[in-house]
Design a protein with these regions (language model features):
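Extracellular/virion structural assembly segments
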Residues: 2-4, 8-12, 20-22, 155, ...
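Preference for solvent-exposed, low-hydrophobicity sequence contexts
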Residues: 1-218
Length: 347
C-alpha cells in the first residue's frame, strides 16, 4: 500500500529551512480534522530570523500545535464493518515552507496521529499505515459474546479491499472506495474456529496483513485494557489471569470540642471529615512470548488508558522486560489506579 506521510505528534516533528542567503524563514501550518478541505488561512504562522550570518539553518517543532487538534475523549466504538475512524483522533496537516517570509519553497500534506517514535528511530520516524505492526501476530480474548472483538486503525488508499481470511481458507471481503483513516474490525464469527483470522488490505499488487489468534480463559475474569499505543490509536490488550482490587481511603481527623461536661459517650471525641477513596487493580497477563514486552512497554508509555471501560492511570512505573531464555514462563503484572474518586466530587 502506498505510504502516506505522517506526523507522530508525541515526538518532535522537525521542519527545517536552510536556504542560501536567507535572513529569516517562515512556516505556515494548516490543520483540520476530517476529510474536508484545508482552511483558507493558516491555523498557525511561525517565523524566526537566522541565528547568524554563518549559520542560516532554522528549525521548527510543529508537534505541540498538532496535538491541540487530537483527543481520545471518545472510547473505541466497535462495528461489524470497516468504518471511518473518529475524526478527533487524527488530523490533517499542510505545511508551507518559506525562505524569508515571501518565497514559497514547497507545500507538503501529512496525516497526524498522537503517536511517537523511539529514540533509536531518529527524528520524524515513519510508523507505517497500520496502528499495529505489519505482518505481525496479535492475540485477543474470544468469549464468543462480543461481536466484533477488537479493531485496528489503518490509512487506506482507495480502491482497496479488506479481506478477512480464516484458517480454513474461507473469506469475507469489503471494498473501500474512498481514501481515508479507517477502523478495521476483528469479527468473531470468523474467529470462532479457534485458529484465528488474518486481516489483509489489498491495494493493486500490494498486500499488508495482520494475523489475530484467539485465546480462551475458563477460570478467571479477563480484564480488558484499552490504551492509546505508539501509533496514536486505540489498542486492546487482555490480562487473563488473577486480578486483585484494592481500595485506599483518605480523610481528615479532628478532635471534637464537647458542648458540656456531660458528653455523649456514643459520639466519641474524634471525627473524620472529607472521607473519600480510590481504587487500584493489579492484573496478570498470563503466559506470553518475548515479543509481548513491546505491548507492555506501550501500555506503560500510554497517556490514555481504560480498564474494563473505566479511565485509569498507570501505577506501575518500572518492570523487567523478561526473556524466555532467562525465564521459561513469562507473566507480566501491572497495577492501575482508576482516575476518579470513589465518591463523586466532580463539579
Amino acid at each position: 500500500m502506498p505510504a502516506v506521510l505522517n506526523i507522530n505528534a508525541r515526538s518532535p516533528f522537525i521542519v527545517e529551512i536552510n536556504e542560501a542567503l536567507q535572513t529569516s524563514s517562515k512556516v505556515e501550518l494548516f490543520i483540520w480534522n476530517g476529510t474536508g478541505s484545508a482552511p483558507a488561512t493558516p491555523t498557525y504562522t511561525l517565523s524566526k530570523n537566522v541565528p547568524s550570518a554563518t549559520n542560516l539553518k532554522t528549525i521548527y517543532d510543529v508537534s505541540p500545535f498538532v496535538r491541540e487538534f487530537i483527543n481520545f475523549d471518545t472510547p473505541l466504538v466497535l462495528s461489524n464493518t470497516v468504518e471511518l475512524t473518529n475524526i478527533n483522533q487524527w488530523c490533517n496537516v499542510r505545511i508551507k515552507r518559506y525562505k524569508n517570509t515571501s518565497t514559497l519553497l514547497n507545500t507538503t500534506d501529512y496525516v497526524a496521529y498522537d503517536g511517537y517514535g523511539y529514540f533509536e528511530q531518529g527524528y520524524n520516524p515513519y510508523n507505517g499505515n497500520f496502528s499495529l505492526p505489519d505482518n505481525s501476530t496479535q492475540y485477543f480474548y474470544n468469549d464468543n459474546l462480543t461481536i466484533p472483538i477488537a479493531s485496528f486503525r489503518a490509512y487506506i488508499t482507495a480502491p482497496s479491499t479488506v479481506v478477512w481470511t480464516n484458517a480454513d481458507g474461507s473469506t469475507n471481503n469489503q471494498l473501500i472506495t474512498t481514501t481515508g483513516v479507517y477502523n478495521i474490525p476483528i469479527v468473531s464469527e470468523i474467529s470462532d474456529a479457534g485458529n484465528g483470522v488474518t486481516v489483509s488490505i489489498i491495494n493493486a499488487t500490494t498486500l499488508n496483513g495482520i494475523k489475530f489468534v484467539p485465546i480462551e480463559e475458563c477460570k478467571y475474569d479477563v480484564i480488558t485494557i484499552d490504551f492509546v499505543n505508539k501509533y496514536g490509536a486505540w489498542q486492546k490488550a487482555w490480562f487473563y489471569k488473577a486480578s486483585t482490587n484494592t481500595i485506599e481511603t483518605t480523610g481528615t481527623e479532628y478532635n471534637l470540642l464537647s458542648a458540656n461536661t456531660a458528653y455523649n459517650v456514643n459520639v466519641g471525641s474524634r471525627k473524620v471529615f472529607n472521607v473519600n477513596g480510590t481504587e487500584t487493580i493489579k492484573v496478570n497477563s498470563g503466559w506470553v512470548n518475548d515479543d509481548y514486552a513491546e505491548t507492555i512497554q506501550q501500555i506503560l508509555l500510554s497517556e490514555r488508558i481504560l480498564v474494563d471501560g473505566k479511565p485509569a492511570n498507570m501505577k506501575t512505573k518500572s518492570l523487567d522486560k523478561q526473556k524466555q531464555i532467562n525465564t521459561k514462563m513469562i507473566n507480566y503484572q501491572l497495577e492501575f489506579q482508576f482516575a476518579f474518586d470513589m465518591i463523586n466530587t466532580t463539579k
